Amino acid sequence: MSKNIYNNNAQNKRTNRSLYDDEDGPAHVLQTNDEDGTNKYKWENRFEKTWLTIDEDEHGLRPSNQEERNTRNRRLKNKDRDGILSQDQRVRRGMQRHLCLILDLSKTLSNQDLKPSRYQVLLQNVELFIKEFFDQNPISQLSIIITKNSKAEKISELSGNRLRHIQAMKDAIAMEGEPSIQNSLEVALSSLCYVPKYGSREVLFIFSSLTTCDPSSLQKTIQSLKNESIRVSFIHMAAELYICKAIAEQTNGTSKVILNEEHFNESLMLKCQPPPTIGKTEAALVEMGFPQQITSTVPSPCICHEKMKYSGYICPRCGVKSCELPTDCQICNLSLVSSPHLARSYHHLFQIPLFNEVNWKELNKNVTCIGCLSSSEKSILSLFFSCPRCQEIFCLDCDLFIHESLHNCPGCENKLQNTNTNTNGKTNGNEITNGNGNGNGNENENGNGNGNGNGNGNGLH
């Protein structure tokens, strides 16, 4: 009897407590679900059970909708990175770039808001940027400038040797003092003012501090940059500075503030794409040499490292040996490149349009990728895209490979080749080639003509 009274009293206490506006009471911790009538904690309702959205087919599990959204976002980032426009639009870009990369090595790099530290994130991403920059712009040149202790120092000259730039960046590990924007831009200006005007002049400043220590006003430096057509862009690892944004706007550059490590990498990779050239820049023919690689049994010195080597590239103008391509001959200043280098730089002028997504489920038929021959039945992601020019269908992997690495649509290339073959293989009427003579005659559109004349000819088709 006493046990029942105790239970009733406890139940009455719980009922009465729910009437009070107590933040720690069960009324604020528990809430009723109208669907099944069960009580759930509030933190359980906020938690989304993402595993319930995964679909399962006969081949196993397929990715959730979140992964498909991430995939589509990646394709859109490629569009922003490459500046893809419509089929009929063309943007004039400089194929030969001269870029000064300025790194802020002040004491602010020791901050750990980016893991493991700003310096480690800077070192890793800049190394990836240098490799990607020369991969997409093989005939371009790059120089690295560091700023700390209110000074600026050039640690690598303008060249196309990626290994030399990476090693020079790793050797400059001291982080101390304050940066100097003016001194850094003056050093970059002294290097870029002597490069040919047919190549683009750019400065990329990775800024980590919130202050700058400059000897004088920056207005004269900004005017000098504008007179030399030097484009200055900033990537901020901290908050944006007004003076940096003003410099970027007046020199036709950009200014971005990173959100996290991934966004920092994306902002850097956007700079691998050549920017549009200024409208007043005139087209110019550039003299280049295409040397052949020669290997001899007797070593000879190279002009770049002054070491005895068996193989190298001989300059077609002065005959001096160089170790690698692309480079500039140190004797006659001739640009030494190879045909693949020009081909990799040429694709920036003619961008591949963004492929359209194909909803193959509504078509009630299976589609097949012409690149890897994967079918919609066996595909894991079940995402397919069609080229707006040739209307051929590609899977997700082939679509990313075409836009990120290949830069050519296989369907368009195959269609163009077939068109040329059919055009050359069709002839109407009789055609006389390799003939010399005088005569008068009329010819219609089908290739048939009548005329009188004297002459000799060979090759009747």
Curated annotation (Swiss-Prot):
Q: What is the lineage of its organism?
A: Eukaryota, Amoebozoa, Evosea, Eumycetozoa, Dictyostelia
- Protein name, per record: General transcription factor IIH subunit 2
C4-type ZnF? 315-332
Extract one GO BP annotation from the record: nucleotide-excision repair
Residues of the region (Disordered) are 1-37, 61-83, 423-461
What PROSITE patterns does its record include? VWFA (PS50234)
Provide the transmembrane region boundaries: none
Record bears the keyword Transcription: yes
Chain spans, region 13 X 2 tandem repeat of N-[GE]: 434-459
Subcellular location field: Nucleus
- Family per record: Belongs to the GTF2H2 family.
Q: Which regions are flagged for Polar residues bias? A: 1-13
Q: Which domain of life is it from?
A: Eukaryota
Q: What would be the name of the gene that encodes this protein?
A: gtf2h2
Q: What is its main location?
A: nucleus
- GO CC terms for this protein? transcription factor TFIIH core complex; transcription factor TFIIH holo complex
Low complexity composition bias: which ranges? 423-447
Q: Record's InterPro entries?
A: C1-like_sf, Ssl1-like, TFIIH_C1-like_dom, TFIIH_SSL1/p44, VWF_A, vWFA_dom_sf, Znf_C2H2_type, Znf_RING/FYVE/PHD
What SUPFAM superfamilies does the annotation carry?
Cysteine-rich domain, vWA-like
